[in-house]
Amino acid sequence: MLNKEVIVIGAGLAGCEAAWQIANSGVEVKLVEMRPIHSTPAHHTSEFGELVCSNSFGALSTDRAAGLLQEELRTFNSLIINTADEFSVPAGGALAVDRSKFSKSLTQTLSNHPLVEIKRFEQLDLPDKNRITVIATGPLTSNELANKLKNFTGLDSCHFFDAASPIIYGETINYDIAFRASRYDKGDPAYLNCPMNKIDYLNFRNALIEAEQATLKDFEKESANFFEACLPIEEMARRGVDTMRYGPLKSIGLWNPKWGDLFDRENRLKKRPHAIVQLRKEDLKGKLLNMVGFQTNLKWSEQKRIFRMIPGLEKAEFVRFGVMHRNTFLESPKLLLPTLQFLKRENLFAAGQITGTEGYAAAASGGLLAGLNASLLANNKSPVTFPDESMIGALMNFISNKNEIMSQQKKNKFQPMPASFGLVPELNNKIKDKKLRYKAYQKRSLEVLKEFKKVLDSSFEKDHILV
């Protein structure tokens, strides 16, 4: 007989969302978090939902895949997105947050929920078979639990190298050189921009290539397996002279009014920087700034020396240096149903980045689905899948055994996937214009989710407080 209380292992974004959805359905939940008893190479606090990499959830606009995913989460009263909205900071057209206030709020909200019991210890094994459990331990799952999952699934977990960017004290930046602007003047001038001429850029690139890197003690005997969407800046420098310029250091769409008339072609060609380093606010007042796209595994002394070569950052003081760590994820298409239940055990769910979704909103969406389905199972009801036309449904299909591409091409190596319109079904009436097509995807998704939510709500008792 199943114990009605649900166990959620891991209080990251997916775990917090799962616990919230379960508790708000009227089911008791035990939320297990190993920090601060046992920390990780990337975490700095014991707060829930700590953002160890960027502080950005991606584009806000619903005609962008990331923005649509955020809006879908709002439809289901997502704790993660609601909290991100509450503690957002200016970031042009993106949703970025004050990471400290964000994680503290998550911790307080769940700690104060009457149906949530917080337990601080390292989970070393899978809970008993009669316990409904959500595994949301994230990409930094402890070695002990990762080995237990390996034994349970019969498969080795996958991994890649991930890294975090440095954070700088805003007051130590030279604002005579750095200027505020957003690319193409979209939204508020939320980014601080440090322009580089060609000589600056080439010297900077050479320094990155020759710099001494920190040792990854767990991987000294392994070749680097980087996640292409989050490459270390020194790896980009090694890949080619202009790789950084076509990535995080691209200057297109950024202009300082001090340089004169943007629409004077001769002036524009003369004054346009060879490259630009961008910094994004970490807090509302801009006291702390994150170096956008500057994930790195350089030694801290090298980071300080080389990043001070950037014009405007000559006297920069660092709140936090960049670090690299191992990210673990499951080969989910061989293990999970689209409901996020394990094929081998129907009362065991997985959610978040450990399943192979990429991005904060995607992690929350996994927590949302796993939490809803754990609640249904606790009430002796059948788990659900999100509509294929929704971004949540498309992502869950991709990471589950419903992923037809994976089933047909067994040799393909499963890699993490962010929200993408390439995952959703084609429209009945094809639209050539990309912007109009994306808007049509958005309209279709929100319409089907509205109907889906009505059906889902009816699955829960009226006295429950789900969504």
Curated annotation (Swiss-Prot):
Q: Which UniProt keywords apply?
A: Cytoplasm, FAD, Flavoprotein, Methyltransferase, NAD, NADP, Transferase, tRNA processing
The record's function comment reads:
Catalyzes the folate-dependent formation of 5-methyl-uridine at position 54 (M-5-U54) in all tRNAs.
E.C. designation(s): 2.1.1.74
GO molecular-function terms, A-Z = flavin adenine dinucleotide binding; tRNA (uracil(54)-C5)-methyltransferase activity, 5,10-methylenetetrahydrofolate-dependent
Gene Ontology biological process: tRNA methylation; tRNA wobble uridine modification
Q: Which cofactor does it need?
A: FAD
Q: Which reaction does it catalyse?
A: uridine(54) in tRNA + (6R)-5,10-methylene-5,6,7,8-tetrahydrofolate + NADH + H(+) = 5-methyluridine(54) in tRNA + (6S)-5,6,7,8-tetrahydrofolate + NAD(+); uridine(54) in tRNA + (6R)-5,10-methylene-5,6,7,8-tetrahydrofolate + NADPH + H(+) = 5-methyluridine(54) in tRNA + (6S)-5,6,7,8-tetrahydrofolate + NADP(+)
> Which residues make up the binding site for FAD?
10-15
Chief localization: cytoplasm
Output the PROSITE patterns linked to this UniProt entry.
GIDA_2
> NCBIfam families this protein is in?
gid_trmFO (TIGR00137), PRK05335.1 (NF003739)
Similarity-based family = Belongs to the MnmG family. TrmFO subfamily.
Query: Where does it localize?
Result: Cytoplasm
Name used for this protein in its record: Methylenetetrahydrofolate--tRNA-(uracil-5-)-methyltransferase TrmFO
Q: Note the superkingdom of the native organism.
A: Bacteria
Q: Which GO terms describe its cellular component?
A: cytosol
Q: Does the keyword tRNA processing apply?
A: yes
The keyword Transit peptide is annotated on this UniProt entry: no
